[in-house]
Amino acid sequence: RRPWHRRPMAAASPSTSDAAERLARLVQRLRRLVRGELILAGGHARLQPQDETDVATALELARELAVPVRFGGVTGDLPAVLAGHADSSRGGLPGLQIDASSHLTRAARFDGARGMIEVQPGVRLADLNRLLQPHGWWLPIETHPESGATLGGLVGLDAAAAALAWGTLADRLLGMDAILDDGTRQLFGPFGARSSVSLNSGRAGQLVSSLFGIAAGVQADMARHWPPGQRVPDGYLLDVFHPRPQRPYTPDGSVNLAHLLAGSAGTLAWSARLHLRLLRRPAVSRWALFLQPSAAAALTHAPAVLALQPSAALLLDAADLRRLAGSHHPDDQALCRLAGIGPGMSGCLDGAQPGKAGLAAWLVRFSGEADADVQAAHRRLTALLDPRRQEGAAGLSLQAGGGLQSHGRAAAGDVQPVWQALLGERVSPTIPPSACIIPLPPQDPATLAGLVAALDERLVSQGVQPSWRGQVAAGELQLVVPEGAGPMARQTLAGTLPPRWTPALRQAFADVRRQFDPTGILLGGR
């Protein structure tokens, strides 16, 4: 099931023939009113808008005609398993998809002194970081090299950086020019007496007033139950109205309404322009790989590993290790040699024995301006995870924009390193054949070892062999089970994990959705 707040408002489901008729009327009117290209396929319509006016017109007419709308093309190849895309009784009805990736791809107003930029939602993350690299800046989100992820989609996910200190895209969002479901345009940004953002319509004024009221009504629940300092992929970021030290969002603790739209997966509004705060690209990075007997054993070290402030701390499973061991890229081969993975270990990586946990590993990166400091951090990590290791105790060097350098070998131009794919798959996972990946809601990293051990015991007792992978700094793990075991694993998770939200918070999420999209036409991403 999709997160409940991603679903449209409850309404009588129209028949397919009625929906098709309304879509035909919408397309007929749009052909006269928009400059973008309209494509009809499979009973649906796809609009590639030339500009923001096309989007505003399309949304206004779609609301009038009750045609469901999806925002496509903004998430690249990010799969629905993480994207939280809406799915409902309306999901199969004829609808309109608005795709930003063809024409809304401009970046503007780059401030190289302060590290700020304005972009349209169809700009691809890889293109932006390529543009910024000569200036020493980057947007610190790392996706799969071939994902084609765009900024509109990543903001919709509130994608997390690999380093806890680098935050999520909500933390990088200074403002958002949004288009609401009725075509109203509004800049969402800092709110308060010192803000220069004005509410330019009665709809916007009423909306903002209602949002503050909703947040005030659940302040007590948030103080007791809101997850501290974590991404919220299954709710809206109501904590922007009650900032806390664990995640202040803004330097002075003020309210920035753009942050509420981060992570909403296109269910609240269209992001027309994003105003982003960039990060200085670190001068040097070093990596290391450490084998562990099991995921639960690896995660017992999580608090100590994270206390060293790595710029990436990934938990790998046996399938990930097999990919590294089978790679022809010298980066991956060097990492495997460092961890003692050789040809003789192939049997250990083939999978766990029945009733036993599978092999796991830490893949850890430290980054900084001074290589001596980065090497020192790796030595402390090596002393923690593998005190007997001598060679490579200072990690393998990764230069900005280059590959691992310490082994002195070049890779063929068409061979991509597996470690880079593994890093990006924390945002956009590759699902192995005959496997099911179930993302867990973000957890406190200090509790992960006990949680994984308990779930391993329950799943193994039911004949399911689990493995675990994920981004430990963000407390986000992915449970991997055989494809047919997915329903049983989900049931076990539901019986083990405590409820995420109180009834009052669930109602608040629904109220936020209703304020933005009262007719329920916005179905989110593709």
Spans of features found by a protein language model:
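A glycine- and small-aliphatic-rich helix-loop capping segment at beta-alpha/alpha-beta transitions
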Residues: L78-L104, L132-W137, L157-L169, S195, ...
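C-terminal substrate-recognition/cap domain of FAD-linked oxidoreductases
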Residues: S254, A258-L505, R526
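Short secondary-structure capping/junction motifs at helix and strand boundaries
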Residues: V67-G72, G136-H144, R185, P387-E391
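N-terminal basic/disordered segments at the start of proteins
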Residues: T16-E37
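Glycine-rich N-terminal segment of FAD-binding domains in flavoprotein oxidoreductases
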Residues: L38-D111, E118-P121, L139-I141, Q462, ...
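Intrinsic disorder at enzyme termini
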Residues: A10-A12, T16-A19, L23, L497, ...
